[in-house]
Amino acid sequence: MARKTPLVRIRNIGIAAHIDAGKTTTSERILFYTGVSHKIGEVHDGAATMDWMEQEKERGITITSATTTCFWRDYQINLIDTPGHVDFTIEVERSMRVLDGAIAVFCSVGGVQPQSETVWRQANKYGVPRMVFVNKMDRIGANFYSVESQIKQRLKANPVPINIPIGAEENFKGVIDLVQMKAIVWNDESMGAKYDVEEIPSELVEKANEYREKLLEAAAEQDEALMEKYLGGEELSIEDIKKGIKIGCLNMSLIPMLCGSSFKNKGVQTLLDAVVDYLPAPTEVAEIKGIDPKNESELSVESSDDGAFAGLAFKIMTDPFVGQLTFVRAYRGKLESGSYVLNSTKGKKERVGRLLKMHSNKREDIKEIYAGEICAFVGLKDTVTGDTLCDEKVPVILERMDFPEPVIQIAVEPKTKADQEKMSIALSKLAEEDPSFRVSTHEETGQTLIGGMGELHLEIIVDRLKREFKVEAEVGEPQVAFRETIRTAVEQECKYAKQSGGRGQYGHVHIRLEPKEAGTGYEFVNNISGGVIPKEYIPAVDKGIQEAMQNGVLAGYPVVDFKITLYDGSYHDVDSSEMAFKIAGSMAFKDACRKANAVLLEPMMKVEVEVPEEYMGDVIGDLNRRRGQINSMDDRMGLKIVNAFVPLAEMFGYSTDLRSATQGRGTYTMEFDHYGEVPSNVAKEIMEKRKG
């Protein structure tokens, strides 16, 4: 089966936005106008094609990025819907990794929200060219031009409108296309499927000319030949303008900006045209860099059908009918279903049973996948998110993804013995799907602990346990993932000796324990010279310390950010063993920690609260009571914005408190920022509770 769509006519794009900017509705309309869905799915009534997990339908928020393929003007668009809630940033981050371009959707009233900034930063990190779609132009308070200035100020980007609105709020009729200099007006009877091209209304001619001039200048700046033409007073043709915008969009020096109302079916076709005209094909983005697993040297992987297969697994889902689906973006070469691939990250061979092309919840079997395509692989056993799949003759590892450590834990107790078995299977499946979710066992109580990026994240996981896996479980109080660290450097000697007839135990070490910068982790340095401790026992000392650091001396929390230097010691020809040195290492570490001025650390969350001015005082007072430190206060769209760092331990149940304090008018977002030291009076309480 030959390739149906040439590589230059493929667009892998994501739709990213803040909650409620209308992202899923926009995706739905794209599917409707490209002829995939027959009935428009509304998020308001929980039937959107893209939102296909039960909880998404119920909460009306998008959790997992579903991928769908659709066609527009003979171009194939692979659409990836990404979640907009802070607790799911990992999902967004994964999708960004495999996108070639993105549409950032902003609400014409809410403008640039904190979550939009996070998503924007992630798109910058992966160098994803993007365009902006200002949605909900029919809402009361809609203001396209204010969103334009917010994008400049808050995101430090350069938005260039390529169409501007005709009217706003209930008078929003259509857009003025600044490239063609025509008005496009949608008629409501045909659900927005038909539109008329008219002359620009007289009252908007001046505004249109002003923005047309800005557009011409921005397009001309991208290319020398265009600049000469523009400065020489020559008219730029439509092709010239499009060429300039595309160059600027690809190198991210400008962001094409459009407007519309997805819910009212206006502006979606012009958005699709812009996707095809300005966002990159897989061949137009920078080459992907990879690593040669044999010698760790850097390789570049170019997008083409020639060459050995290479692809990246970016999402895993469990499907009740097919089992595990692994979503893969192919970067190079082609692959047939039924063939073998190498998982170069794990060094294991995998067989691809079937290849499925996904429509957000329907699927079609395909024979082979080509470069630039995205599809689901069925039958992979060991592959997890972020692994590279490639031809075993030409191994390559595409970028590794880094996943954040969980900041919150809760205990889950299965209700019956049968639930116990189902739960362990379910949790391991969920952990495969979501690398920012961890499962562990509490050492003392034997309880199962689940950890994640926030309360909502874990709520949804518990919900999925009940619905998808039919596990009845009791959920404990949320526990904060505290850590311990040390503040002063100390030296410590420890001799572990048991010699009372027969084979004894003997291990003797001198270690130096030093604090390191926050977030730099653990480091072990071997400074033994002259063989005072034989080489084979040194890893045992390291292992002993690594085991001991899981339970700190203050309250049994993991110890982080320190350096150990092993610099002296002694051994016994007969009695020394790995075990003895492991015990000596762990005892030395514990003793050293007691003298090294150990402190407790807690996760500090970056909190942004948005409230009407009259509640400002109460909100700040409340954040101070929660041991928050206020960083800044701003105004946005007539509301006050408070930025603060607040300990996670003090933020439980905040949404309810904020709602009652502001009569439901305040909103907030929070994401993990860093670990900070716990004040001594609070630390004392925590330690007493732990020792209980």
Swiss-Prot record:
Record keywords, A-Z: Cytoplasm, Elongation factor, GTP-binding, Nucleotide-binding, Protein biosynthesis
Domain of life: Bacteria
Residue stretches making up the tr-type G domain: 8-283
Endpoints of the signal sequence: none
Gene Ontology terms for molecular function: GTP binding; GTPase activity; translation elongation factor activity
Cellular component GO terms held in the UniProt record: cytoplasm
Main location: cytoplasm
Protein location: Cytoplasm
InterPro entries recorded: EFG_II, EFG_III, EFG_III/V, EFG_IV, EFG_V, EFG_V-like, EFTu-like_2, G_TR_CS
Gene Ontology biological process: ribosome disassembly
Binding-site list for GTP: 17-24, 81-85, 135-138
PANTHER family membership: RIBOSOME-RELEASING FACTOR 2, MITOCHONDRIAL, TRANSLATION ELONGATION FACTOR G-RELATED
Annotated family: Belongs to the TRAFAC class translation factor GTPase superfamily. Classic translation factor GTPase family. EF-G/EF-2 subfamily.
NCBIfam families: EF-G (TIGR00484), PRK12740.1-3 (NF009379), PRK12740.1-5 (NF009381), small_GTP (TIGR00231)
Stated role: Catalyzes the GTP-dependent ribosomal translocation step during translation elongation. During this step, the ribosome changes from the pre-translocational (PRE) to the post-translocational (POST) state as the newly formed A-site-bound peptidyl-tRNA and P-site-bound deacylated tRNA move to the P and E sites, respectively. Catalyzes the coordinated movement of the two tRNA molecules, the mRNA and conformational changes in the ribosome.
Protein name from the UniProt record: Elongation factor G
